[in-house]
Amino acid sequence: MTASSRNVRFNVSDDYEILDVIGEGAYGIVCSAIHKPSGQKVAIKKISPFDHSMFCLRTLREMKLLRYFNHENIISILDIQQPQDFESFSEVYLIQELMETDMHRVIRTQDLSDDHCQYFIYQILRALKAMHSADILHRDLKPSNLLLNANCDLKVCDFGLARSAVSTEDSSSFMTEYVATRWYRAPEIMLTFKEYTKAIDIWSVGCILAEMLSGRPLFPGKDYHHQLMLILDVLGTPTMEDYYGIKSRRAREYIRSLPFKKRVSFASIFPRANPLALDLLEKLLAFNPAKRVTAEEALQHNYLEPYHDPDDEPTAPPISPSFFDFDRIKDSLTKNDLKILIYKEIMSMNN
């Protein structure tokens, strides 16, 4: 069936009735729909990736990883529309759970209570514990990638930039596609620490918590230099130990050229916040990635005590770096090679 909503054509099976366009991105559009046999409301994400290799790679990562994880706080793929044949295959249709809104919209339209902040951060960290136990870095955690429903259930989405945490690829390759929103980027990414760890996701969670507490982004940098300045305006000039933790000589010289800055207390920035929230925030936003808490440690923090249950915070089996073999050889893959990989991935799900 070809359905249209706002002049958008969705070539999906007759099992689905398309309702409304609910989101648009660089290479995709999302509609709400009803799965007629079950009556279930779903979201259908239409992706047209074949114009750019980068979009193909993102689509492949997203499909493979969302199929791998089976977690309450990670969006799942219910189905993928099977193409008629390889030759005419030009669009990917992912059928997913329907979530009503996202954290970006919620923060923009209402003040969040402390209870909301607790519950949302708990769910983000619960998802992150599973991802990190599987040796996956999300690399693009931000409010718009946190989907919410009316019950305040939270699900992390958009794994298009995800990577193996044990990858052998060098940092320059790791960064090639790094277009993650600057405001949630850890300082080591800008200072080229040479190796990137699970701590980059933890930093993003800290930025999200800060934004939930105040309703505004904590570090809304206009460019690379401004971003770093805003971080140092709050955290202060790095200690000698943290300074020498920066492997890049050029980055160290740049930091040394900046005027000395004193640390600003989070209590003065967020005067109405729960002190326990601010204590967790300090641990999430440590300048030195080696000193940041892990997702598992953060879940045990007193701020999250109302929700923490060690028996209900599942891990996931580690993913072999070979899962991302296509990423390692991506420079030698043609768009047709990538199309074949995506086609095979879809057919394997439908089998």
UniProtKB/Swiss-Prot annotation:
Identify the enzyme class. transferase
Q: Do you know which Pfam families this protein is assigned to? A: Pkinase
Q: Which residues carry this modification: Phosphotyrosine?
A: Y178
Coordinates of motif TXY in the sequence? 176-178
Q: Which cofactor does it need?
A: Mg(2+); Mn(2+)
Is the rRNA-binding keyword given for this protein? no
Record's cofactor remark? Divalent cations including magnesium and manganese.
Query: What is the documented function of this protein?
Result: Serine-threonine protein kinase which may be involved in pheromone signaling. Functionally complements the MAPK pheromone signaling pathway in S.cerevisiae.
**Domain of life of the organism in this record?**
Eukaryota
List, from the UniProt record, the residues annotated as the active site of this protein: D140 (proton acceptor)
What name does the UniProt record give this protein? Mitogen-activated protein kinase 2
**The family this protein is said to belong to:** Belongs to the protein kinase superfamily. CMGC Ser/Thr protein kinase family. MAP kinase subfamily.
Domain remark from Swiss-Prot or TrEMBL: The TXY motif contains the threonine and tyrosine residues whose phosphorylation activates the MAP kinases.
**PTM text:** Dually phosphorylated on Thr-176 and Tyr-178, which activates the enzyme.
| Annotated ATP binding sites | I22, G23, E24, G25, A26, Y27, G28, I29, V30, K45
The source organism is: Pneumocystis carinii
